[in-house]
A protein has these predicted regions:
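Zn-dependent metallo-beta-lactamase
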Residues: 28-108, 118, 342-343
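Bacterial N-terminal signal peptides
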Residues: 11-21
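Metallo-beta-lactamase
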Residues: 70, 79-80, 85-87, 109, 116-118, 123, 198-200, 208-210, ...
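Active-site HxH/HxHxD metal-binding segment of metal-dependent hydrolases
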Residues: 31-34, 38, 44, 119-123, ...
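Conserved beta-strand hairpin/beta-sheet module of binuclear metal-dependent hydrolase folds
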Residues: 76-132, 230-252
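Bacterial N-terminal signal peptides that target proteins for export
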Residues: 2-13
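Binuclear metal-ion centers of metallo-dependent hydrolases, dominated by the metallo-beta-lactamase
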Residues: 291-343
């Protein structure tokens, strides 16, 4: 019997809520001054438009207030999200928890991320495409941003039904094969996730996929996982070209590991320069809480002629987005100390 989307998602989020935080109780030599310095830098970079990613700093500075699940239950009472065309060839498919993006090309459709499981792939991805007047049989590639079940879980369903190529980094394919389990959950893989897909197409840093004139360039951005992918591609808004980056992994749900948090921060510094060279002016996430996709889609519904597309945030906002991620990672590192066991 199929589990309802609401019930399944509630259990899934509960698990993530337990795993995504990094408790300061692990601290050995926490540095409150450094925490404050990095949180201040992240807050300055966030301004008023990047409050979603700024929430990552809460792992370093927990404060009283509604719990994650309180906020999630309030969110659940809202109507489900409908699929939506957000650029000339870019479509939102997803829930209020996890997102898939569809890129339409002259040669078929590319899906970026496959959500939690087969039910969601069928309901949100396949069903969402049909609602938008697109044919899911035209899916040619499914890009899996990283080896966590909330992004690969529906991939095998799509593979079996439509036979697209499944794309992930070599590093994260190896992680799945070595453990035969979701790296996030170790020996306790969440049964709400679909089975890990079978290895198909591996990409490395700097590789490109071409489909009928549309090019996707992949960068390996170690941090969230060691093989997380950022996918960079050109989209158009009413014919005007823009450069988008789908940043494949955001939270620090790998545990209290100072070296890993430093790696995460180093990655954001490196890719600020790379995305500056790419002239990226759109950032996309696979969770709506990080790219504010819900508010942006609402703005598009009321968009008047001549108004800008809310998803086109500009190169400065892309740079600030990465600054927030990196500074919150360093704040979290300072909050847990350098002598944390298991680093």
């Amino acid at each position: 019997m199929k589990m309802s989307h609401g019930r399944a998602c509630t259990r899934l989020i509960t698990t993530f809520a337990l795993l995504s935080g990094i408790s300061p109780s692990h601290a050995q030599k926490a540095d409150p001054a450094a925490v404050a310095e990095h949180v201040a830098a992240a807050t300055a970079a966030a301004k008023s438009d990047l409050l979603g990613p700024l929430g990552l700093c809460k792992t370093a500075t927990p404060t009283p207030g509604p719990s994650f699940m309180d906020n999630y239950r309030a969110m659940q009472k809202k109507p489900p999200l409908e699929p939506m065309q957000v650029m000339d060839e870019l479509y939102f498919l997803g829930s209020r928890w996890t997102t898939a993006w569809a890129i339409k090309t002259a040669g078929g459709i590319i899906i970026v991320d496959a959500m939690d499981n087969a039910d969601e792939a069928e309901h949100y991805i396949e069903g969402g495409l049909r609602k938008l007047g697109l044919d899911p049989a035209e899916i040619r590639y499914v890009v899996i941003s990283h080896a966590h079940g909330d992004h690969y879980g529906g991939a095998q369903y799509l593979k079996q039904k439509f036979n697209p190529r499944l794309v992930m980094s070599e590093i994260d394919w190896n992680a799945l094969e070595e453990t035969q389990r979701d790296p996030l959950f170790g020996t306790k893989r969440n049964p709400l996730f679909g089975e890990p897909p079978k290895r198909d197409m591996a990409v490395a840093d700097g590789d490109t996929i071409q489909l009928a004139g549309t090019a996707l360039k992949f960068y390996v951005i170690p941090g969230h996982t060691l093989g997380t992918l950022a996918t960079v591609f050109t989209v158009h808004d009413r014919g005007e070209p823009h450069r988008a980056v789908a940043w494949g992994g955001t939270a620090y749900n790998f545990g209290p590991l100072p070296d890993r948090l430093q790696l995460y921060s180093d990655t954001t510094i490196k890719y600020r320069e790379i995305l500056k060279q790419e002239n990226a002016d759109i950032f996309l996430s696979n969770h709506v809480s990080f790219d504010d996709a819900v508010a942006k889609m609402a703005a598009l519904k009321d968009r008047a002629p001549g108004q800008p597309n809310a998803f086109v945030v500009g190169p400065d906002a892309v740079q600030r987005f990465l600054t927030v991620l990196g500074e919150c990672a360093l704040a979290t590192k300072a909050s847990i100390g350098e002598d944390t066991p298991g680093r």
